[in-house]
């Protein structure tokens, strides 16, 4: 009997050590055209994710919109280049995308509206910076306008800036130290982890390249690990066991 009680206590200790990660909706969620209002609202309202991730591009007239690519091919408009098109013209287009056999339509979502949704549903924004005019390793001249939007919605303390552009993160950490930062990586080298420690950033890694030793190394340096993009339960549980702090997903239910 004593052995059974001890085993149960040990199991409880192990379980309590595996803290459930914070869940982030990838480009909002599966339910809707990615990176649009419907997907963001469903990520917060339907799935209950604590954070919503978006990708940022800039328009011809310097406005920040939520989209992953340089063009709108994913939404059915291959010839529409975001950097060469005004916001008004982009918003006149109907985006269409089929996901899991369901076809959705939408219009492009501004970062302003995305942040409004985050505020309304009490979730934190994860703003991924893609290479764009005025927001890239060589030129961050449009970042102040993006920061102004974050400030406008009272989300400075909650917002996470995510990007693979190291120089951009160094600019943000130097000029906007109040913002949280994550360094986006496919695979990770020791120097990446050390850089995150030195620049007070966390790290976001493709899930297949995460293991317990890597997470422990990061945590020992005060660096939290986020995993992307996780869409099955077995992978999710493996990452929980590894000790990941954040998991980005399209449609996993919160455990």
Where are the model-predicted features located?
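Phosphate-group recognition and catalysis centered on beta-loop-alpha active-site segments
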Residues: 17-255
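Bacterial Sec-dependent N-terminal signal peptides
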Residues: 1-21
